[in-house]
């Protein structure tokens, strides 16, 4: 029996974006932090337990710049240069996130999930390495 799967353009675009995001793994990136550690989300009111920002000049599946969580920096920062160690691929959303860390820092998948749970608990996701 042969199974044929049809993928509509939207799903293909999401898969393609996800594959492109894997290009960042292991690379050093300059990021801009627009939601500093301890700041309050303007719409939903939760507090950011980590610095959260984006990679300038990129585009994610939601049409905005590619978002990222900055782990291991325990003070609010405006910009940062760090290494991408993982991609948070949202299965039920178009908005993947990068995991950025300071040099020589490593986090297990369990540790990453614990640190990003404040926001990712609303989405099905996998950690891609």
Question: Where do the protein language model's features map onto the residues?
Answer:
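N-terminal amphipathic/basic-hydrophobic helices that include classical n-h-c signal peptides
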Residues: 1-15
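Hydrophobic N-terminal alpha-helices or hydrophobic patches in metabolic proteins across all domains
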Residues: 16-129
């Amino acid at each position: 029996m042969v199974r044929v799967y049809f993928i509509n353009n939207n799903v293909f675009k999401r898969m393609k974006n996800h594959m492109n995001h894997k290009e960042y793994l292991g690379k050093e990136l300059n990021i801009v932090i627009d939601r500093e550690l301890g700041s309050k989300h303007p719409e939903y009111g939760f507090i950011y337990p980590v610095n959260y920002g984006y990679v300038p000049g990129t585009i994610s599946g939601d049409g905005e710049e590619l978002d990222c969580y900055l782990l291991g920096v325990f003070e609010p920062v405006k910009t940062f240069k760090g290494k991408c160690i993982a991609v948070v691929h949202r299965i039920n959303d178009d908005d993947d996130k990068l995991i950025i860390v300071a040099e020589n820092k490593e986090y297990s998948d369990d540790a990453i999930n614990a640190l990003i749970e404040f926001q990712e608990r609303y989405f099905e996701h996998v950690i891609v390495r």
